[in-house]
Amino acid sequence: SAEAFAMGGVSLLDGLGVVDMLCFGSESGEISALKELAEILVEEPEEYKKLLKSFLSEGLTFPAARSQALTEYFKNPRNFSGDDFDGVLTPLLNEVTQILNTPNNILGIEYCKALLRLNSQIRPVTIRREGMGYHETTVPEGDSASSSPDLQSSTDFFASATAIRSLIQNPGDGHSEASSDINNPVRNPDTKTANILSSQIPPDAFYVFKKALDSGEFLTENSLDSILSYCLMKENVESLSSYMDVSEDLARRIINQQNLLLSFSQSVSVLKTRELTQTRIQRALLHIILNIHTAPTQIPFARVLGFRRESSELLSQIKQHSQIPLITKLADAQNLLDSEGNQILSETVFSSNLYEKLLCLKTGRKFCHESQKQLIIL
């Protein structure tokens, strides 16, 4: 979830002891409103809780009830804690529903909530997200994008990650929706597709991205089809309910629909309901595959994957000020971490090795265990 993701990232940065600012993108681009909303959601004042309970009793989903409760709560001027009641906060907080309906705003609020809960000294700042919406599935080509009356500037046709993935799975068709064919393979991009991608991805990143595509090193969620089928075959309602994000209702739904579940993406479509969103189902199925039952409240270590030579001083500062163990070699981890830390690291290594194994099965390359991978130094 956005809440767990944000808490994990923020607790890691806070534990390093050298981070003084957290910058993230959001649709609103205004930190004051995001901080104000975060404060209410963390403190949960009595008036807000009563409003939330009332809207939930009317049958609204939790996100909808939360939006309505916050909208009503901020109709009272006394409930503003910020200093800009007549400035930035007022117009933005009058659009609570719009703010809470956009994914990057939601994640930004969760970052602010995590900072508050940790009593962190890190200061949050935000920049306005440019380009198409987070869930947009089309990638307009350069010429058509620049002439479109719906696009106001050159940055309006920056594609979303969802759209880029859709384009890769439908090569040569930058305007098609994501394929519904569960067996649709990821093919190497043709010239037209590659040109569209190159206009949407920074040059250095595009080089790495295209190299991976050309060599077949690109996985989709349906790469997990067989593994998911195996995992679900050996579960029952009680055991499924023990996995993170799997409620008893979802567990029963999985068992009842098991004969209809084919691929990963098709299973998500079959299982989702009004209350159980697509992203919730995706997370739940991944947790079943990866055998994840609980989320840590904080990340108890930091693992260095790589660094630039000119930034080596920063690494020295982290080693000096970090409040959590810093791991550069997996072989040293067992002696540096407690039981919880070793469990989390074990889950991380397993996930990485599974991904590596799937790539090897697809491309035929030699398997490289996570512990054998070298630190990247640029």
Describe the predicted segments one by one.
Residues 1-378:
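Active-site cores that bind ATP or allylic diphosphates and position pyrophosphate for catalysis
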